[in-house]
Amino acid sequence: MARKSVIQREKKRQKLEQKYHLIRRSSKKEISKVPSLSDKWKIHGKLESLPRNSAPIRLHRRCFSTGRPRANYRDFGLSGHILREMVHACLLPGATRSSW
């Protein structure tokens, strides 16, 4: 299980990303529309002034129950071994074990 501080840090990043999402998106659209290089640099400086953790690339998908950052399934929001345990315990409706 991931440390609580790591999970809280990830939640803080998600809040920052949501807060600055529209500003970041509008600035990127402006850069593509503006023809002059000096104006592009000004807009780029505005983008750089935003908090670093507000960038969506810094987010990690984490397991809902354990906080594990690797081997996550998007559909369930769980890591692989927790997903397997829950399927074996019949806790996920519609998920079946493969057998051949």
Curated annotation (Swiss-Prot):
UniProt record, GO biological process: translation
Gene Ontology annotations for the cellular component aspect, listed alphabetically: chloroplast; small ribosomal subunit
Q: Which InterPro entries match?
A: Ribosomal_uS14, Ribosomal_uS14_bac/plastid, Ribosomal_uS14_CS
Molecular function (GO) terms listed? rRNA binding; structural constituent of ribosome
PANTHER family linked to this entry: 30S RIBOSOMAL PROTEIN S14 (PTHR19836), SMALL RIBOSOMAL SUBUNIT PROTEIN US14M (PTHR19836:SF19)
What functional role does this protein have? Answer: Binds 16S rRNA, required for the assembly of 30S particles.
Quaternary data:
Part of the 30S ribosomal subunit.
Q: Please give the family membership noted in the entry.
A: Belongs to the universal ribosomal protein uS14 family.
**Protein name (database record):** Small ribosomal subunit protein uS14c
| Organism annotation | Glycine max (Soybean)
Q: Which gene encodes it?
A: rps14
